[in-house]
Design a protein with these regions (language model features):
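Alpha-helical transmembrane segments of multi-pass small-molecule/ion transporters
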Residues: 1-272
């Protein structure tokens, strides 16, 4: 456990700390962090999503475990959304973002890189499956947000608009490559690897910059609610669901529980 903390979590913390200090020293600004996050969301994350999807062994996924996670995620999402709407009196679009931030884990840029170095393929597959679901769930949320923002826009046009969502396209492309058994040229594979490897360091550095910014009291209260749901309640709820089913080995659920207790996901940060 100590080795896991030192070898896997410490590098993540160090990179966030470097971003934090560089912002406090005015080397980087909040605007710089937004530009970095935009690169991560538009370029690096789609490449990483495609790379991860191509690595999954679908036949080896424990779908009972995945559906347990999805069920817990939906409960957290709806509960946090309703608290944002009716206790903090937020607008519906803001409440949806609170729900996303409280339930979406940073599995892509936090859990996956750590797990890749510490666990075998059987424990990596659940993370990849959850990433695939969350990309779809993200698109559903974006459709709802667009319906709220563009009330005069037809649902058909909003649906078509989602195909400009690069992580979704990466997911579809990855599944198509797997199903059609397409061989990727070495040059493309190396470029994909090169871009994908930049996602986590850039996102973590930008997160450090953002953490250095001052928050209003209301924002702090909402942040505390998000932390409570994401870091504490979600893993507890998932563990309870897995325990209730009584047919899932907890040793196989280790990385899934890691995802449930991971920090807030990148996409909620981008769209907020």
């Amino acid at each position: 456990m100590i080795n896991l903390l030192i070898n896997s979590f410490a590098p993540v913390a160090i990179l966030i700390l470097i971003g934090y200090i560089s912002a406090k020293k005015s080397i980087f600004s909040k605007e710089n962090s937004i530009a970095i996050i935009k690169y991560v969301g538009v370029v690096a994350v789609p490449a990483l999503t495609l790379k991860i999807i191509l690595s999954i062994s679908i036949s080896n996924v424990n779908w009972t475990l995945i559906f347990s996670y999805v069920f817990s995620e939906l409960i957290i999402y709806v509960t946090a959304l309703l608290i944002g709407k009716y206790i903090f009196n937020l607008k519906w679009n803001e409440a949806i973002l609170i729900g996303m931030a409280s339930s979406f884990a940073n599995h892509l840029l936090f859990v996956y890189p750590i797990a890749l170095n510490e666990y075998n393929a059987d424990l990596i597959n659940p993370i990849v499956a959850i990433i695939g679901f969350d990309v779809i769930f993200l698109v559903i949320n974006l459709i709802i947000l667009d319906l709220i923002k563009f009330q005069n826009l037809k649902l058909k046009n909003i649906f078509i608009k989602q195909f400009s969502n690069l992580p979704l396209l990466a997911l579809i492309l990855g599944l198509a490559i797997i199903l059609l058994d397409i061989e990727i040229p070495v040059s493309i594979e190396r470029a994909l690897e090169f871009i994908a490897n930049s996602a986590a360091p850039c996102a973590l550095f930008a997160a450090g910059i953002i953490l250095s910014q001052k928050l209003e009291k209301t924002e702090i209260k909402i942040s505390n609610i998000i932390i409570l749901f994401k870091i504490i309640l979600h893993p507890i709820l998932l563990i309870f669901i897995i325990w209730s089913l009584d047919n899932i080995d907890f040793s196989l659920a280790e990385t899934t529980i890691m995802v449930a207790s991971a920090p807030v996901g990148l996409m909620a940060l981008i769209f907020s």
